[in-house]
Amino acid sequence: SFSINGWSYNEDVGIDRVQVLLNQEVISEVNYGLPRHDVVSAMHVLSDPNIPNLGFTLEIDTTKFENNLYEFELKLVNNLGTVIRYGKRMVSINNL
């Protein structure tokens, strides 16, 4: 398994949810809304309605997936329903 931890914000609008995609399919939704005062300060977040709860975390059980190379990406959905895809990269799952 592996953990995904991060943060996301959208000034004036706010983030509604963050989903994890593998090969462009939603596999899970993260636990969004964890306190991240450091992000508010470092990124000068002023008007996101979720301040200071901009953090997220998720534990992914890799045994649910075949050993392979996957396209990983986050799908951010703001409170207006606008979708932003972020962080696309290739990840290798290799369960021993």
Indicate where each model-derived feature is located.
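Basic, ligand-binding patches in group-transfer machinery
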Residues: 1-96
